[in-house]
């Protein structure tokens, strides 16, 4: 729970944190979750596989892998 006096500041901090994250991956996750309940499991798994293939070619993916190997925090660019 967040005190009423801190809601605006906390919401702004959360928005900034999300905006600095892997936004393409967030969008794919949101899409997969929204669509997953209305199709068979095999279709959901195929869609997830395709999403991972797409995301694996992004700049953000390369950034994340390099940062992980260097034990650093990644700086995502949204692509």
Give residue ranges: language-model regions.
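Low-complexity, intrinsically disordered Gly/Pro/Thr-rich segments
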Residues: 51-52, 63-66
């Amino acid at each position: 729970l967040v005190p009423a006096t801190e809601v605006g500041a906390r919401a702004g901090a959360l928005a900034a944190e999300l905006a600095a994250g892997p936004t393409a991956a967030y969008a794919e996750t949101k899409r997969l979750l929204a669509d997953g309940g209305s199709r068979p499991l095999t279709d959901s798994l195929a869609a997830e596989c395709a999403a991972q293939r797409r995301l694996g070619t992004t700049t953000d993916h390369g950034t994340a892998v390099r940062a992980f190997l260097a034990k650093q925090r990644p700086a995502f660019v949204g692509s």
